[in-house]
Amino acid sequence: MEETNAFSAFNQLLMSQNVVSPTKQPMELTNEKLMEFVRNAMQNQQGLPEVPNIIPSALPSMLSQIPTQPMPQMPVVIQTSQMNDVMGDQMLKASPSASSDMSSLDSDVADHPMTMMMQQQQDFQNPLQQLTIDSSANIAAGVNGNTEQRSSGRHETWLECFNTTKFAEYEALLFSVYVAERTDRKYDGWTYFDCLHRLQSKCRYRVRAKKQDEFYIIEEKGVHNHGAVEPVGQAGSHAGLPKTIREIVDRSYNENWPVEARTIKVDEEIQRLGLPENPRLGRQIDNRLAYLRRVKNLHETRRIQDQVNGTMVIKDPVKEAMLQALMEQNGGQLTVGQGFVDQIIANQGIPEMPIKKEEPTQPVESMEMAEQVAKPLAMNPSPDFFQFLQNQKLSHEHEQQQQQLHAAILAQAQAHAQAQAQAQQNLMESQKNIHQ
């Protein structure tokens, strides 16, 4: 035997009303049918005459003539939606034992149109409700979307982080956040600073500061997007070798120390200073040695160029000693008599060193040679130029040997003259003693 459903009539009413859907028929047609249905029901059940136009002054008397009868229940047209479809399916499957559940659903259905109408009125009063569109073309309503976008994007705002009246505290704060002043100016009263590792780590942390009256105001934007970086200037960092270790490296290069001796000295100095382990120490020492080699090569090249160009002043101690001996031998005068040196050499029996005599060249050729020498060195010198430098070096060495020989001869002559003077003085003293 089939079970009867107490709510079958109500379900049929809902199904018949679901046919009249706002998505299938216009809303105006539904409202007209509803109003016609209401008029017919009131005329049939209450027996009221059809009054097309009611005068407002006669309305109280007409209301007093209406018999007091219970008001009929007005049918309600429920706009269907996905939620209503689901609710309708649940109602069709309900059983007589679920009366309490159906009553709760009936109350929900009755309250749902009211809440929808209130929400529509609020939306009508505030239609935009601060809508924002993000990059993914999704619409986010309300203030929360704006705050989330500001916090997650690059639109950071300047926040005051510190203010003081002391310049020392102002400098200490700027030093503690590891920022450097920007070179460009915005002329808005602020001084802008960037992170020291802005280019290395693409850090977007920024600081700006200004002085207002007696206060130093500091604001910041963003955060550091990199980890702990070794402070600039700390011993053992990329700032360079400490002064004492640099002096040890320079001394080892100038005195040609072996690598083992230099390493021992450097390790002892590191232990004495208490520096941390530096994995870049070997590279820094190599860079310092390469710098010393470059400086030495540059000085040597410049000395050769000055010597070739004739602009170098050679300070030779042998020449100074020779000139001093000549002055003493010649009574304090630089000029000596002709044949003075030859006479000394003949008296000592020292053979004269053969001197290579070069043939005199034409003045035109000497002018051309001087112009060639005066020109700067080319990037790729020819072999003739190297031969010319070698000849200049040999001639310079030959001149030095001659100067040393002359100095030795002068020293011997001076010693011989002093010995003769001393012997003559001793002879005169002995003769005086004999006469006495």
From Swiss-Prot:
It comes from the Eukaryota. This is Uncharacterized protein T05H10.4.
